[in-house]
């Protein structure tokens, strides 16, 4: 057995400082240690397991990181199974692509006769993906390694490896520079919204909440939703769904609302007494309490 498994400890520490999915990384590590490594080197496996778990807390929050992960797993969106926590849907083109990709890789992994611990991880990730499609990317990434063991590329194809690597780097650079394609409000609308809000929190949907935050404004709730109290999470999800209970988000000091046109949220705001449309641009409508126009 390789001693390189100790590298998982610093890797998990770095990962935990970047994204909450490090918890899945810990799960994969524990599966390997318990199912395979513990039979040969139980004490080493135990040491790596303990240090790996501790590595998740190697963040500025320290032991409070445990509360963060608890909040991630128990947030209102996860409990309701909505948004990125929603189940796979054949009505979603991206989910269909995910299912087809995962099916091909899982078939390849099965033919390669994965190790027992790999099979355990694949099964668990597959079940997680069915209940929450956000986990699908980790299923696909993990399945690549065992599936690739069945591949025996021709010598002539190996010369394409450097070309493929260069193209991948170029594509990655383009994606980083371009950024994600999101439904966004115009900068002028965000500026006006902050001016009308006068320091009060802005209620916004989609990626618009992130724009408001980046511009220095306050938001009533947004992504990541687990950063807000559970009661606020539930009301915000009701509001996003266009549910009448979501109107509770407007009973406080919210004066300005930004929504994407044509959504259920916009339909709710259109019939909300006390709020009037104060402008629209690029598919985003701004509502103001009382109105200034």
Task: Label every model-predicted segment.
Residues 5-20, 28-31, 51-55, 123-129:
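Membrane-interface alpha helices of multi-pass inner-membrane proteins
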Residues 232-286, 290:
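Periplasmic/luminal catalytic loop of GT-C fold multi-pass membrane glycosyltransferases
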Residues 49-51, 145-175:
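Signature aromatic-anchored transmembrane alpha helix within multi-pass, membrane-resident enzymes
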Residues 25-50, 153:
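Perimembrane helix-loop-helix junctions
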């Amino acid at each position: 057995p390789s001693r390189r498994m100790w590298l998982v400890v610093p890797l998990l520490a770095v990962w935990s400082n970047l994204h909450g999915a490090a918890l899945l990384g810990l799960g994969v590590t524990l599966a390997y240690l318990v199912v395979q490594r513990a039979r040969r080197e139980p004490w080493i496996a135990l040491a790596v397991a303990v240090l790996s778990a501790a590595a998740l807390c190697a963040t500025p929050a320290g032991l409070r990181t445990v509360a963060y992960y608890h909040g991630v797993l128990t947030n209102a969106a996860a409990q309701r199974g909505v948004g990125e926590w929603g189940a796979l849907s054949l009505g979603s083109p991206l989910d269909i692509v995910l299912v087809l990709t995962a099916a091909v890789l899982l078939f390849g992994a099965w033919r390669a006769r994965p190790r027992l611990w790999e099979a355990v991880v694949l099964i668990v990730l597959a079940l997680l993906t069915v209940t929450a499609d956000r986990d699908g990317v980790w299923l696909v990434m993990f399945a690549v390694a065992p599936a690739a063991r069945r591949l025996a590329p021709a010598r002539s194809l190996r010369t394409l490896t450097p070309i493929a690597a260069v193209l991948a780097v170029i594509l990655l650079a383009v994606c980083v520079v371009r950024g994600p394609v999101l439904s966004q409000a115009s900068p002028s609308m965000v500026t006006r919204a902050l001016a009308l809000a006068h320091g009060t929190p802005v209620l916004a949907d989609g990626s618009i909440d992130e724009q408001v935050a980046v511009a220095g404004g306050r938001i009533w709730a947004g992504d990541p939703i687990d950063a807000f109290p559970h009661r606020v999470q539930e009301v915000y999800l009701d509001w996003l769904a266009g549910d009448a209970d979501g109107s509770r988000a407007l009973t406080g000091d919210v004066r300005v609302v930004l929504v994407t046109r044509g959504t259920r949220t916009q339909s709710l705001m259109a019939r909300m007494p006390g709020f009037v449309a104060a402008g629209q641009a690029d598919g985003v409508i701004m509502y103001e309490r009382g109105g200034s126009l």
